[in-house]
Amino acid sequence: MSTLPQKAPGSLSQAYQLLALVALSGELPASQLSRLAGGTSYKENVVKSLKRQRLLLSYYKNGLRGYRLTAAAKKLLLEHNPERFSFYLSGACATNHIRSEPEQRLRLHRVSQTLITMRNANVSIFRDEKPGVFRPGETAIGSICTPAFYTSREIKETGTTFVKIRGARSVGVLLTPQHIHVVYNMGNALMKWSYKAEMRTKALMQTVLCRERMPHQYHPDAVRGLLLGDSMELAYELLTDQGGKNYFVLDGSYERFCFLTNDHHGEVLLRLLCDEELDNDLRELLLLDLEPRQLSETVENDAMTPDGAPVLLAYDCDLPRIRRFDTALRLQDRYGILICFDHQVEVLRRYCGDRAVVQAIDFAAFERRFFP
């Protein structure tokens, strides 16, 4: 029988990073192991080693497989960095005492998947790396200088106001220096949607962050929506309302609601979304040979062609803007130009049909230039 280690793995090691991610979410879906840094065989060996040391265990039930921490792993992490882990590994919280119902586990899996997307996009996820924006009694919050993600459990620290929101589907909030993004993760299927619950979530963000805790940084208009999903096909289903009224996400809850995939494409675009300067550089590059934006136009646009066709930059996959653009073209029997990344082209071309010419940005070339 292997003996228990006396201390946690080094904080820079893959083993530590894996244990830390499991700690924050409660259960990491086995399918997400491929998204962590390192080769496949190396990561498999890391998992085997942690199991041998009795720090990690596999849990399989109802067709769901995930990784959970053992009591020994929790003890080591708490001893190593209590500021980082005590919130998740103490008491009867959902990440410490995990329920076995499929729906509860799926929510933990969606949170875990979101944390990986954020971490891979260089967004701060650990409590000792970001301001205590939602901590009760916090008086000196300061400003958000670098992107930081707070899970829905962290948000509920504020008090009973957030706890009382029933039916809200958000997994957390991403704070950048300029914006507040309420984050939703659909995973591999459309999710049920409650307009009233999500409007309450948005209103509370505006009250707690924009008016009470951080009015020096955020205006109420800074609150946006960010939607994560496993494939661009989900974006098509949302744009075409295939889920019916119970899945009607694009109901006006958020004027800006970007869709990103839970993969390398989405992680890179998330980095762009969090960096206003880089985003402006890309916009300027794409609009070089076009006429200026026309605010008086009846079709939403970012620029105009010399012959008067509206142009929409859709690389951020802002679904409400794309739908408004397409609807206006259809109603006015006009054509326009939509610019997006190559991995988004097929879905957006299928959605717009012959109403829009969809032009592709080479994603690989973009990444080499903007994130060398």
Regions found by a protein language model. Give the residues of each.
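A general structural signal for short secondary-structure junctions and capping/turn motifs
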Residues: 48, 173, 214-218
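Short, ordered beta-strand-loop transition motifs
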Residues: 58-63, 175-177, 304-306
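Long, compositionally biased intrinsically disordered regions
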Residues: 183-192, 197-372
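General detector of folded, globular domains
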Residues: 72-82, 88-91, 101-119, 171-173, ...
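Basic, Lys/Arg-rich alpha-helical nucleic-acid-recognition elements, primarily the DNA-binding modules
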Residues: 1-90
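Exposed, interaction-prone assembly regions rather than primary DNA-binding/catalytic cores
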Residues: 95-195
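Short small/polar-residue motifs
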Residues: 51-55, 165-171, 295-300
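Short secondary-structure junctions
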Residues: 54-58, 123-128, 284-285, 292
